[in-house]
């Protein structure tokens, strides 16, 4: 097998013509396919960038909403703790006031009862003394002593 280097005898010219025609026809066809593919890829990239930008904006908004919600939750927690402390303090003060009122009422009741008992004892002592004096008076008071008592009482009444 020998190589034939004679261009006229070979199909080089034919090959060049066929290759030229193929390149000329396929350039439009393959170029269109490649151009459409390039446009589709560029469009997908633009869509991805748009979605990324939208997602970034939504993430930023969600993060700011989360921060605001956390601040609101912290404020609610602090307000709740303050309110619970105020309610607890108010309850303690009411309990102390109620206990003081009960104690004061008990002391007043005890004082009133003591005063009532003192009055009863005074009356009973006075009645007992009067009864004793009335029982002892006739034996101790003779006519002469009775006259002196009456005179001294009249003198005391005149001086008064």
From Swiss-Prot:
Q: What residue ranges are annotated as transmembrane? A: 13-33
Report if keyword Disulfide bond is assigned. Answer: no
Where is this protein localized, as stated in its record?
A: Cellular thylakoid membrane
Which keywords label this protein?
Answer: ATP synthesis, CF(0), Hydrogen ion transport, Ion transport, Membrane, Thylakoid, Transmembrane, Transmembrane helix, Transport
| UniProt membrane topology term | Single-pass membrane protein
Q: What is its main location?
A: membrane
Enumerate the GO terms in the molecular function aspect.
proton-transporting ATP synthase activity, rotational mechanism
InterPro entries attached to this UniProt entry:
ATP_synth_b/b'su_bac/chlpt (IPR002146)
CC annotations in GO? plasma membrane-derived thylakoid membrane; proton-transporting ATP synthase complex
Domain of life of the organism in this record? Answer: Bacteria
The record's function comment reads: F(1)F(0) ATP synthase produces ATP from ADP in the presence of a proton or sodium gradient. F-type ATPases consist of two structural domains, F(1) containing the extramembraneous catalytic core and F(0) containing the membrane proton channel, linked together by a central stalk and a peripheral stalk. During catalysis, ATP synthesis in the catalytic domain of F(1) is coupled via a rotary mechanism of the central stalk subunits to proton translocation.
Subunit composition? F-type ATPases have 2 components, F(1) - the catalytic core - and F(0) - the membrane proton channel. F(1) has five subunits: alpha(3), beta(3), gamma(1), delta(1), epsilon(1). F(0) has four main subunits: a(1), b(1), b'(1) and c(10-14). The alpha and beta chains form an alternating ring which encloses part of the gamma chain. F(1) is attached to F(0) by a central stalk formed by the gamma and epsilon chains, while a peripheral stalk is formed by the delta, b and b' chains.
Family the entry assigns: Belongs to the ATPase B chain family.
Its protein name is ATP synthase subunit b
